[in-house]
Regions:
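Non-heme Fe(II)-dependent double-stranded beta-helix
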Residues: 2-37, 43-184
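Short hydrophobic-aromatic micro-motifs
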Residues: 42, 206, 251-253
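Short, well-ordered beta-to-alpha junction loops that form the rim of enzyme active sites
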Residues: 46, 165-167, 207, 223, ...
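A conserved hydrophobic position in a structured secondary element of the catalytic/binding core
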Residues: 119, 221, 253
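A short, structural micro-pattern
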Residues: 162-164, 198-200, 267-269
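A structural signal for short, well-ordered beta-strand segments
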Residues: 166-168, 204-206, 273-277
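Catalytic core of non-heme Fe(II) oxygenases with the double-stranded beta-helix
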Residues: 173-244, 284-292
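Conserved double-stranded beta-helix
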Residues: 227-258, 262-334
Length: 334
């Protein structure tokens, strides 16, 4: 396959202005090409610099957290949750066509998400600062882009920042999924359009188990980031392909890439650790929800508008872990 850097071939757009040496030094030229061309790349375990011991430690930390937040439900990679879980009323999915698991005539819910991973263990913090992952994120997010003068040969500051503390999507066998359109969406869909070449958001997902289509793998539409728009939710699923990868792989994709997931049809867990990044400009200059909380923000002609402008009722940025986790209601181990 062609490469985007070197070899006498036409250089990619970003190579002229952004960290080509880092990509070359880490032997990531092919992955940079795939990000440009397909909007997603899979880095095999042997190229990430992360040992299987560290991957297993991350797994143990996530499974221990699952047992903690569910109120004691045992769980393993082989068997999945070994107990009955009550998901409560839940909340309506943002994906069109997704079954409401609360209704009795719909499949039982078989997935939950754990947040704030980098609080849990050193292994997960190491994944967040992995050199290979960050080189690829730098490549598609691009530089800070400020107007400060640079010394000759000096590179502009890097612009990627953590958007959250990482999430683990814990998924087990069942018919419940993201609906007929596979939940296709893109991560920067809340950003103003039209988008450009640079990614405003970027995911780096570590496959903590083997990924296969039957095993509920991530899916994506190759090249969809070039459309610079969100999927319509009508009929794009046939374009999606599975992200199939061995345990310990790194999957990086552009914020404009359409992606979702297949339902998991096999026993055991499908587990990942997903580190979500953003361009540094995708934020406010001042955290007004904090700085104005105890100030007279409502002393104005239109308090309702001021509340909206400050963003007191916005979902993001979260000021703590407000996730609702399923609760362990009984063992199913015989």
């Amino acid at each position: 396959m062609p490469t985007c850097l070197g070899g006498g071939r036409k250089l990619s757009m970003m190579q002229n202005i952004w960290h080509p040496n880092e990509i070359r030094d880490l032997n990531l030229e092919q992955h940079a090409f795939e990000l440009d061309n397909d909007g997603l790349t899979i880095v095999p375990p042997e190229k990430t610099g992360v040992s299987m011991e560290k991957i297993d430690r991350a797994i143990d930390a996530i499974l221990a957290r699952f047992t903690e937040v569910t109120g004691g439900c045992p769980i393993s990679i082989k068997d999945g949750p070994m107990g009955e879980l009550d998901f409560g009323e839940g909340r309506k999915s943002r994906f069109p066509g997704v079954a409401d698991a609360v209704k009795q005539d719909q499949p039982k819910q078989t997935q939950t998400t754990l947040g704030q991973l980098i609080k849990l263990d050193r292994s997960l913090r190491d994944l967040a600062v992995n050199q290979v992952a960050n080189a690829l994120r730098d490549y598609i997010v691009g530089p800070e882009g400020n107007n400060a003068p640079q010394e000759q040969g000096e590179l502009p500051p890097k612009a990627r920042r953590l958007s959250n503390g990482g999430s683990a999507f814990v998924k087990w066998q069942g018919d419940y999924g993201y609906g007929p359109n596979l939940g296709l969406h893109c991560d920067q869909n809340g950003s103003a359009m039209p988008w450009g070449r640079n990614s405003l958001a970027c995911n780096g997902m570590w496959t903590l188990t083997e990924y296969s289509k039957e095993g509920g793998a991530l899916c994506y539409v190759p090249g969809s980031h070039k459309s610079m728009k969100v999927p319509s939710g009508n009929g794009e699923a046939h374009l999606a392909v599975p992200v199939e990868a061995p345990k310990g792989s790194l999957v990086v994709w552009h914020g404009g890439t359409w992606h979702g997931a297949f339902p998991k049809l096999t026993p055991g867990l499908r587990l990942n650790a997903t580190i979500y990044y953003r361009h540094m400009m995708v934020m406010s200059q001042e955290n007004l929800r904090v700085t104005m909380e105890n100030e007279p923000w409502d002393d104005c002609e239109n308090p309702d508008l001021m509340r909206e402008l400050i963003g007191f009722d916005d979902r993001f940025p979260s000021l703590g872990n407000k996730r609702k986790y399923p609760k362990f209601i009984g063992s199913n181990v015989k």
